[in-house]
Amino acid sequence: MKKIGLFGGTFDPIHNGHLHIARAFADEIGLDAVVFLPTGGPYHKDAASASAADRLAMVELATAEDARFAVSDCDIVREGATYTFDTVQIFRQQFPSAQLWWLMGSDSLMKLHTWKKWQMLVRETNIAVAMRQGDSLHQTPRELHAWLGKSLQDGSVRILSAPMHNVSSTEIRRAGVSDGIPPAAARYIREHGLYEK
């Protein structure tokens, strides 16, 4: 059975931490592919500072060297807010017999019960969680306790041994884009004058 990992994010910009956790995701779960899904209009984040087209181009450039990585614009071309459940449905239709895995950080796990159709989502896809420094499963909201306990036991939720890097795209933009960005994406940023102060 084919195993496909889905990795959504604003990727504004994509950085080495994203690539590191995507490789760990692929290695630890034994994925055939990791599909990066730059968001169009995420309902739970502030507007991105680079256009969707620029973010898509940067992700394509940054992921080109790993044959396991693919990029989809499905969340960009959809009109309106994009929800994870809808994205997973698109991949479920394209790959009906594949085992789907959704990658999220522990910060997202703590808010999962607020996501649109979260209970249906977790029936459609397995979840891989990258823990952020300082986060603990003991902090999980009460609304998720029963589901998380069962899911950790049956293997439909896996905690990755590789931690999330404590660097964010926001910090990279504030500090000035240079370190921590894959070279091809950094070149694109310079050539297109993105994130200039």
From Swiss-Prot:
SUPFAM superfamilies noted in UniProt: Nucleotidylyl transferase
Gene Ontology MF terms: ATP binding; nicotinate-nucleotide adenylyltransferase activity
Function: Catalyzes the reversible adenylation of nicotinate mononucleotide (NaMN) to nicotinic acid adenine dinucleotide (NaAD).
EC number: 2.7.7.18
Record field: catalytic activity: nicotinate beta-D-ribonucleotide + ATP + H(+) = deamido-NAD(+) + diphosphate
NCBIfam families reported in the protein's UniProt record: cyt_tran_rel, nicotinate (nicotinamide) nucleotide adenylyltransferase, PRK00071.1-3
Family, as annotated: Belongs to the NadD family.
GO biological process: NAD biosynthetic process
Species of the source: Neisseria meningitidis serogroup A / serotype 4A (strain DSM 15465 / Z2491)
Xref: InterPro entries: Cyt_trans-like, NadD/NMNAT, Rossmann-like_a/b/a_fold
Protein name: Probable nicotinate-nucleotide adenylyltransferase
UniProt keywords, alphabetically: ATP-binding, NAD, Nucleotide-binding, Nucleotidyltransferase, Pyridine nucleotide biosynthesis, Transferase
Listed pathway(s): Cofactor biosynthesis; NAD(+) biosynthesis; deamido-NAD(+) from nicotinate D-ribonucleotide: step 1/1
Broad enzyme group: transferase
